[in-house]
Amino acid sequence: WPNPKQGHYVEAWQALIDAKKWGLIRSIGVSNFLPDHLDRLIEQTGVTPSVNQIELHPFYNQAEQRKYHEAHGIVTESWSPLAHGNEVLQHETLQQIAKRHGKSVSQIILRWHHQLGAVSIPKSASAARQIENLSIFDFALDEEEMKQINGLSRPDGRIRNQDPAVYEEF
């Protein structure tokens, strides 16, 4: 998290840049950075993050953030790609798409992430569910299905109202 009130994220970023220069790490990225935060990092250090891990799921698809990432060569990684709770998994639109493809709603959502170009790493302790989550490469969502899922996004879609513009992790 950028923790904007503390204002030390550029210093922390510089430490990561140094660690990369010293060969301690190969790639550096951030989590929950908005375009303004990213612009500041890039302007002050000249180094663009490789990845930005952001909240991304059908109820909060972050279209503008993803456009920024694409324009700057930043990989989008989705945290909470399946959202939380059963609301998204029981959504009628997603269930209909899943039924058409003979897949689970989770597989539909993970395929949606893949087709958006986002990296999703769903959490699961179940080996069977982990295998299911990887079985998303034998089908594709069509343009209309992608539009339907994108249309589920809503302004109040954040899981815990953790807005990176004001949220403080510590």
For the regions a protein language model found, what residue spans apply to each?
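Beta/alpha (TIM)-barrel catalytic core signal, keyed to glycine-rich beta->alpha loops juxtaposed to Asp/Glu
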Residues: 3-170
